[in-house]
């Protein structure tokens, strides 16, 4: 079976908040986050999750992708949908635990994604996080 495919969540308005967050970083930090996302593209049924310290479970099927650059810590919250890994929310981490507000944003985007996929199934998006409904 083929590898999973990481895609950016795309809002109803066409916005891609995770991509926008990454694009707003300096080149070194952007490259580090993109390397972590590329690790997700290597996952498959045989290896469905990245090990700690790259990733960890947040709640239910919601997971966090971790990235450290010196004293800066970044998180991308994501969830799987069949063969897709949907990148839902990205933020700089400044506390010990992922704040509930950040989790709520990711869960809201997941419900939006899931609702639109069920309402109108589409062809899978392009690889490496180009787009998702």
Regions found by a protein language model. Give the residues of each.
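Basic, Lys/Arg-enriched alpha-helical interface segments
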Residues: 1-73, 82-85, 92-133
